[in-house]
Amino acid sequence: GYNLAKVVLNLLYRVTVDYQDEAALERIPKRDVVVYAMNHRSNVDYVVVAYVLAYGAHVSYAVGEWARVWPLEYVFKSFGSYFIRRGFREPLYHAVLEQYVHLITKNGVTQGFFPEGRLSRDGRLGSPKLGLLDYVCRTMLDPAFDRDIWFVPVAINFDRVLEDRALIRELVDEPDRPGRLAQLWTVMKYLGSNAVRLVTGRLKRYGRAAVNFGTPISLREWLASAPGVLQLPKEQRLPQLERLAALLMERIGAIIPVTPVPLAAAALLSFGQTMIPKAAVLDRMDQLRDRLGAVNAKVVRGGARIREVWDRAWRMLRMRRLAVEEGDSVVVLPRGRPLLEFYANSIAHLLPIRSPRVPFHKTHEVDADLPRLRRSGEDGGGRGR
């Protein structure tokens, strides 16, 4: 899977990797089991983590059945994935799945899973699901299993999520809701078009894909503070495991990478107006970056000049037609607001400034107060698309 991941990512992003406590990761005993718990931003998450961990470990993922089509089935199997039916209620199926998870855990297989259980539709971190977490934890009940299990929080963020418009449509209009195959088709189209651009020398990457690894959590230590939890009946056990799931999500949220586009989106939306002086945007970005530094947030290229960070973000905002320049001001286009909210939401929990809520709804694509813009080929012209 490494070679494929490398090709795909080089077509799309510049990858940044950082560690909250690399020494703690290195101290995990080799014989213990490592489980990476990740937030779920994009279907590209699998590829990003496979690429980052290629020389350290092969990771077994739980992937939905939507991926069991050629060539995706081959791709995900090359990353060590197994396929599950999400939302399937058949008890026998879950009994078999639980035994499979126990088997790979007892044999020391490194695993990766997404506690949220689905892609984020609005950009925010979602509530955790408990199924796979419960299965992994209950491996500790096996008398022959004498290892520890370490949960490693992994936070992923992008300057561009390939499926962002499709994800937002799920919150906009029920009849227009795309299926998972439609989302994957969007990703495949991007890969194809970028492959053509690579051959013709016109390749432009979509900014940063950033991955941060957090401080690992020892399951044995956690269970020592909650003795007898795994022996409880399921209806009593799961509420207790919610505390572990919440701890994982808290750790993930604390290390979410702040790439240029989410930072710029948060700054733009914090004003609550359509036209904003560019100097004010840069000042607000600088203020937000200082705040992020104060809470030890992981800011990508945090030492760069704020104008440089803005320029990197602006290339994406302009290319996506989310905003245009009007003299010395930046104008947020109405159709761009939901996408800006999507990216700003990814770091909203780290910031004191809350942008005005802009519901994901079609009525917000028309803004009577938007100034009439001059047409220019580079800006996309008119009132946006």
Task: Give the residues covered by each predicted segment.
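Membrane-interfacial terminal anchoring regions of lipid-handling membrane enzymes
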Residues: G1-R385
